[in-house]
Amino acid sequence: MTEDEIRVPIYFMAGFLESGKSTFLDFTIEQEYFQIDGQTLLILCEEGEVEFDEKKLRKSRTAVEILNSLEELTPERLVAYDAFYSPERVIIEYNGMWQVSKFEEMQLPRDWGIVQHIVTVDASTFQVYMNNMKSLFVEMVRNADMVLFNRCQTDMPLASFRRSVKVVNQSAEIIFEDEEGEIEDIFACLLYTSDAADDLIGV
């Protein structure tokens, strides 16, 4: 299905717990560019460290549904949401411990389709997750349009972080942010190396 054929666009957000998904969404919801005339359905698949502001949700005509387990995320439930809300768009904050492939392989309601896939990463814990849950992260970023590393510090091995993504998904846009916002992309000419490929052997 092409984007022109999609009636209900899905904005899919993945990332491990406390990676900044909720913070990113809470900020986005109040931005002028986010506002549309129709209903937005926000499906939360885990409880993050940030609670969404009810006033912001009402102002942006955003309805929230919370799913507590992967078993609750079914084609039938999504069809029911489509019938009940008639959403103009859907945002899914996916649980970082669930395989992304489970959703990618799911039969979606008629004319629903993913138009943007974003992954958020807490740079301060990235290496720990890569050491322990590499396969989950690789699956998250394989089809991502954007990978956002937040809580970055200049003494972190950011070039290595970038290579870890590019070896899996060369087309993904990679953004590094610190507390002040986006860090200038100093890696524009940096090509991924065999080091990153070696790191991912066995995934």
Regions picked out by a protein language model, each given a short descriptive name:
Residues Y192-V203:
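Single conserved hydrophobic/aromatic residue that forms the stacking wall/gate
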Residues E105-W112, A123-V168:
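Conserved C-terminal guanine-recognition region of P-loop GTPase G domains, centered on the G4
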Residues E76, Q127-M130, I186:
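Short, charged, surface-exposed secondary-structure boundary motifs
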